[in-house]
Curated annotation (Swiss-Prot):
Pfam families: Fimbrial (PF00419)
Functional summary from the UniProt entry: Part of the elfADCG fimbrial operon, which could be required for adherence to host epithelial cells. ElfA is an accessory colonization factor that contributes to adherence of bacteria to human intestinal epithelial cells and to animal intestinal tissue in vitro. Binds specifically to laminin, but not to fibronectin or collagen type IV.
Gene: elfA
PANTHER family for the chain: FIMBRIAL SUBUNIT ELFA, FIMBRIAL SUBUNIT ELFA-RELATED
The organism of origin for this protein: Escherichia coli O157:H7
Family to which the UniProt record says this protein belongs: Belongs to the fimbrial protein family.
Cell compartment(s), UniProt: Fimbrium
Keyword Protein transport: no
Tagged with keyword Zinc: no
Signal peptide: 1-21
Name of the protein described by the UniProt record: Laminin-binding fimbrial subunit ElfA
Keywords: Fimbrium, Signal
SUPFAM superfamilies, A to Z: Bacterial adhesins
InterPro entries the record matches: Adhesion_dom_fimbrial (IPR000259), Adhesion_dom_fimbrial_sf (IPR036937), Adhesion_dom_sf (IPR008966), Bact_Fimbrial_Adh_Pro (IPR050263)
Length: 179
């Protein structure tokens, strides 16, 4: 019986020592590192401009008879920026992504899905109305101003051959690069 009590006592002492030793080796402290960044964007894009629809005027097919001929009826494409801070950056470029026309590679292809006009594309321009904006290509430098501003681009119909009447549609997603 003494052996049983002694054996039980030794077992309890060993088990307690093991638990205490395990607690001494347990990892109870650590650290968490947080990384982040507060940015000061140059401008904020006005929400109404983000996904806008520009309705072009109707143009007679007789104004678009030969490849490269434009209708001469340019339509404004306004992009509104607000809260611009030129202490952050003074310049921007735009990239208008979309499907380039196969004949007029500087123009956006007509993507109308029903009753589409043929031999017609859409040519975008910088605000001067003469500097063409090629799809998927960065524009020239645009000087930003402090506060709110509207950057105005232009668009016009351009013939890729003798145009026929019908719908014209193109979509371009744009990206602003501040530098």
């Amino acid at each position: 019986m003494k052996k049983s009590v002694l054996t039980a006592f030794i077992t309890v002492v060993c088990a307690t020592s093991s638990v205490m030793a395990a607690d001494d080796n347990a990892i109870t402290d650590g650290s968490v590192t947080f990384n982040g960044k507060v940015i000061a964007p140059a401008c904020t894009l006005v929400a109404a401009t983000k996904d806008s629809v520009v309705t072009l005027p109707d143009v007679s097919a007789t104004k678009l008879q030969t490849n490269g001929q434009v209708s001469g009826v340019q339509t404004d494409v306004p992009i509104e920026l607000k809260d611009c801070d030129t202490t952050v950056t003074k310049n921007a470029t735009f990239t208008f992504n979309g499907t380039a026309d196969t004949t007029q590679i500087t123009a956006f292809a007509n993507q109308a899905s029903s009753d589409a006009a043929t031999n017609v594309a859409l040519q975008m321009y910088m605000n001067d109305g003469t500097t063409a904006i090629k799809p998927d290509t960065e524009t020239g430098n645009i000087l930003l101003q402090d506060g709110d501003q509207t950057l105005t681009f232009k668009v016009d119909y351009i013939a890729t051959g003798k145009a026929t009447s019908g719908n014209v549609n193109a979509v371009t997603n744009f990206h602003i690069n501040y530098y």
